[in-house]
Curated annotation (Swiss-Prot):
The name this protein goes by in its record: PhaF2 protein
Region of interest: Disordered: 95-123
UniProt topology in membrane: Multi-pass membrane protein
InterPro entries named in the record: MrpF/PhaF-like
Gene: phaF2
Organism, as annotated: Rhizobium meliloti (strain 1021)
Amino acid sequence: MTPAAVLSAASGVALVLLSLALLLTVLRIIRGPTLPDRVLGLDMLVAIAIGLIAVIAVRTGFYLYIDIAIALGLVGFLATVAFARFILARGLSPERRTPGTTEIPQAKPRPSQAGRRKRKGAR
């Protein structure tokens, strides 16, 4: 077998496996019982898309796709951080609260500024 044939076969198998993973991840996003499950599914979807783009770049020889995959990775990371902050700001969902309580746990207050030394030039 020539190296080109091996590369073609390997990229074909990789595309099939990544496509299957993409379908299963979309299923997880649709069926996910909680919002964190869906956010994790979206993060996984971005990772699979990066893999697909990389395999297509190797298969076609058009390596500009790698730059697109890097940009997608950065956007995916920022989206995951934003979703995580959104989930934290919402508090615990009703099904995850401690049974018998109706209150949402509050963040601890910050320690007082007493005892801290002021920086030079600060008011």
